[in-house]
Amino acid sequence: MPSETQSQTSKAKLWVSYIVSAIPVLFLVSCGIAKLVQPAPVLQGFAQIGFAQSLVVRLGILELICTAVYLIPRTSVLGAILLTGYLGGATVTHLRVSDPKFVAPVILGVFIWGGLFFRESRLRALIPLKRD
């Protein structure tokens, strides 16, 4: 039976994971919806990076699907992997046009994996941050 300290630590890790994960999830959901709605700034941004406007909705759907997979506890690791690929593409796209915003997808990826790290003990076993 876990001690009171262990269960408090587990609860604390769980809450930290929710907070850390909420930041990129809120950003990704709002960006995905913006791609579906297609306001002028989104279309202008796509034009600046050299993407066809026909990709806006497709990328918005992809972004929302990957985020939904991340939000489902049973598929959260798969969602993190999918979002890593998506955000990697975003990073390269920004770097290709010398856009200084290339760091934003990297930070989102760190938050995605950080939130998952706090709530997924199997991930902590695979990537230990300290030696026992």
Set out the residue ranges of the language-model regions.
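Solvent-exposed, well-ordered loop and adjacent helix/strand elements within mature globular domains
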Residues: S30-L55
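Core segments of alpha-helical transmembrane spans in multipass integral membrane proteins
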Residues: S30, F51-L71, L78, V110
